[in-house]
UniProtKB/Swiss-Prot annotation:
Pfam families: Poxv_Bcl-2-like. The gene is OPG036. It is found in: Host nucleus. This is Protein OPG036. One of its GO terms (biological process) is symbiont-mediated suppression of host cytoplasmic pattern recognition receptor signaling pathway via inhibition of IRF3 activity. The keyword Secreted does not apply. InterPro entries: Poxvirus_Bcl-2-like. Induction: Expressed in the early phase of the viral replicative cycle. Keywords: Early protein, Host nucleus, Host-virus interaction, Inhibition of host innate immune response by virus, Inhibition of host IRF3 by virus, Inhibition of host RLR pathway by virus, Viral immunoevasion. GO terms for cellular component: host cell nucleus.
Length: 177
């Protein structure tokens, strides 16, 4: 059987597997098909967790003080601790940005957040992406308390790979059995 024939039949096989509630006893299924199904299910689950964490993060950044005080979500409670991390890391820069925002409230502000680089024992440099994303979330949370339109700062300063590392961190901490 050629590979093009196999590719054309694969969706049909998957449909048959999903349509049949239970395989008859004694029947066997090609291990490649089982692996394909498992990969597909894992990708769907991972995408669901990732999009849920992004949705929780976006919701957190738009919550007012009363909603934050009354939340029962452990992830949001953790996000709330990131504000102090941002203050400790960025210090006076937070106040300077807030001053600029108050001075020109209708202007789009370009906010570039610096990353703290750590020297490794091999005399190279690295940035811990999870810690950086936590500090940026805290920084954006502080800005949004003044006026909740600054969520773009998060996505302008954080690369996709850094955000993915953060999502993996949250998934590992809160969604692992």
């Amino acid at each position: 059987m050629s590979s093009s024939t196999m590719d054309n039949n694969e969706p049909k096989v998957l449909e048959m597997v999903y349509d049949s509630p239970i395989l008859p006893e004694g029947s066997s299924m090609d291990p490649n098909i089982i692996n394909c199904i498992n990969r597909h299910i894992n990708m769907c689950l991972q995408h669901t967790y990732s999009s849920s964490i992004i949705a929780i993060l976006d919701r957190f950044l738009m919550m007012n003080k009363d909603e934050l005080n009354n939340t029962q979500c452990h992830i949001i409670k953790e996000f709330m601790t990131y504000e102090q991390m941002a203050i400790d890391h960025y210090g006076g820069y937070v106040n300077a940005i807030l001053y600029q925002i108050r001075k020109r409230p209708n202007q789009h502000h370009t906010i570039d957040l610096f990353k703290k680089i750590k020297r490794t024992r091999y005399d190279t440099f690295k940035v811990d992406p999870v810690e950086f994303v936590k500090k940026v979330i805290g920084f954006v949370s502080i800005l949004n308390k003044y006026k909740p339109v600054y969520s773009y700062v998060l996505y302008e300063n954080v690369l996709y790979d850094e955000l993915k590392c953060f999502i993996d961190y949250v998934e590992t901490k809160y969604f692992q059995n």
